[in-house]
């Protein structure tokens, strides 16, 4: 949409600059490019944007989802678009709040042109509260995993041993072993030695973060 007021919330300076310039070329009025929650809320007060494009992971502090919820409280009709490498936001926080109604979730690795992003931003402006299916709910290896399994997946990726995970969670090592087997099954990892299984799980974790190793 030509001249639609947009704020860009992205903690990476290079992405913030290049993406902002590209969207300006598509006709959006880029009112602010900010890298944290505080500046995003201030930008909304100052510029009254029609839509916000946010990264999920903004580093230490509030997430993009937290920011979006605050933006929507201040303006119930603001369009919300998330653009991230994460295939499932629970990899940031397994207990994330629900996304604002009508939010559009885009994966950076699936967006091969800024035109596609611009189209989705326009949809968010025209129909900010439309019911939309979220991609991690309907597809992907993490879709059938519980929040607890997601947390154990993150613990494995952080290098914790089975005994350390069990101690942290106050359960038996056998219970953690069972969870690891379920996780590997959900991820489509074939049975193998424990060390190789962990390597495969860690690889899957980073792939789903959009940071393949």
Q: Predicted segments — roles?
A:
Residues 184-213:
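Basic, Lys/Arg-enriched C-terminal extension of HTH/homeodomain DNA-binding domains
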């Amino acid at each position: 949409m030509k001249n639609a007021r947009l704020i860009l919330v992205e903690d990476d300076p290079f992405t913030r600059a290049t993406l902002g310039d590209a969207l300006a070329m598509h006709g959006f009025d880029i009112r602010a490019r900010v890298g944290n929650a505080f500046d995003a809320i201030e930008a909304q007060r100052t510029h009254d944007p029609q839509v916000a494009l946010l990264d999920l992971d903004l580093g230490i502090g509030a997430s993009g989802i937290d920011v979006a919820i605050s933006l929507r409280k201040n303006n119930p009709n603001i369009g919300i678009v998330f653009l991230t490498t994460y295939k499932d936001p629970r990899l940031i926080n397994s207990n994330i709040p629900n996304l604002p109604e009508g939010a559009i979730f885009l994966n950076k690795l699936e967006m091969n042109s800024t035109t596609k992003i611009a189209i989705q931003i326009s949809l968010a402006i025209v129909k900010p509260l439309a019911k939309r299916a979220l991609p991690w709910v309907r597809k992907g290896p993490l879709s059938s995993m519980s929040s607890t399994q997601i947390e154990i997946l993150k613990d494995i990726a952080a290098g914790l041993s089975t005994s350390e995970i069990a101690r942290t969670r106050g359960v038996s090592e056998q219970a953690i072993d069972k969870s690891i087997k379920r996780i590997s099954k959900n991820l489509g990892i074939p049975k193998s030695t424990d060390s190789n299984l962990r390597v495969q799980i860690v690889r899957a974790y980073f792939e789903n973060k959009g940071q393949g190793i």
